[in-house]
């Protein structure tokens, strides 16, 4: 069945019972095209943004993750899930520091977590052909490799893939600083701006001190 559940959690892990931390829980059902577009539109509203002052003196806004990467995770799960497995759905789980997409079925063909960047196989070729006609996939087998490259270019950890007997888990993560905290672009730029301000203040203070000492020496 074509159904996707998107869950947004408050924090970095899923909790249950009295500590349950689910803040959004939406289920999307429908034809493949509408389902895919609806899921992508909703997930985009849940991706955090960071606004900071760039080196050119202009404010910039970056998303937590490159848009292509989380889009690729969602689209691939819909295109390649094992639709013969009943009783469970695709689940997109969004946490403060990572996104995990769970897709029913093991990796198809000869695709394995260790060769997923190079190996390509369509479990559902008719669905893939249909999605390609609407430019949701290209079927060149380069999407996962591009995702790895875009995460690296953004300074983020490499995507992670693992599987068990009937489920594939794909995860993208935020970078963390030395203290284990999620480091946003604002943190990096804060350091840069701090260094720049320190240099500027140092120059200004140096000039003022020089002028003051010069005046004192002249008076004496």
Question: What residues fall within each predicted segment?
Answer:
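C-terminal regulatory or interaction extensions
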Residues: 1-220
């Amino acid at each position: 069945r074509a159904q996707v559940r998107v869950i947004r959690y408050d924090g970095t892990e899923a909790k249950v019972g009295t500590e349950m931390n689910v803040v959004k829980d939406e289920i999307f059902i429908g034809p493949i095209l509408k389902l895919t577009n609806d899921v992508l539109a909703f997930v985009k509203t849940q991706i955090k943004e960071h606004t900071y002052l760039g080196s050119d003196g202009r404010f910039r806004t970056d998303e937590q993750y490159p848009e292509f990467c989380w889009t690729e995770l969602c689209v691939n799960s819909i295109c390649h899930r094992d639709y013969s497995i009943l009783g469970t759905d695709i689940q997109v789980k969004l946490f403060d520091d990572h996104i995990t997409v769970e897709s029913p079925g093991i990796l198809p063909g000869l695709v394995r977590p260790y060769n997923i960047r190079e190996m390509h196989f369509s479990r559902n070729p008719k669905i893939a052909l249909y999605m390609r006609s609407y430019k949701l996939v290209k079927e060149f087998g380069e999407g996962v490799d591009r995702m790895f490259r875009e995460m690296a270019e953004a300074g983020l950890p490499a995507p992670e893939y693992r599987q068990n007997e009937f489920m594939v888990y794909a995860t993208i993560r935020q970078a963390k600083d030395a203290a284990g905290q999620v480091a946003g672009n604002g943190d990096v730029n804060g350091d840069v701006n701090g260094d720049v301000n320190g240099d500027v203040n140092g120059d200004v203070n140096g000039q003022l001190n020089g002028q003051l000492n010069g005046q004192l020496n002249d008076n004496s």
